[in-house]
């Protein structure tokens, strides 16, 4: 069951979350996919499947959102209990994250270099608590 925008905005404010360039549309629709009682732990943006996606980590799952330019929205998710490993690498300008869940890898590229290590650690800790 989706929550109202205020619920999500309050959680993002507690995290001192900044609006991320390139995922403003997705942030506006995040309340449509967050469930009542689900807590947002962090978020960032990354490049996946040819597009820039919002990646939101909650206490239950990792949610990926890609809002189309004019219409449509794509959503993917990984339940934290299914995450078996998460790895990152950084380069000069950015970083990449690889999440292994259910025997398959999801690779997220072009992440902010400042975010990639923190997001990797956040997912690892949340997955450990969820299993």
Model-derived segments and spans:
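Acidic, Ser/Thr- and proline-rich intrinsically disordered linker/docking segments
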Residues: 2-35, 45-51, 68-131
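Polybasic phosphoinositide-binding surfaces of eukaryotic membrane-targeting domains
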Residues: 50-63
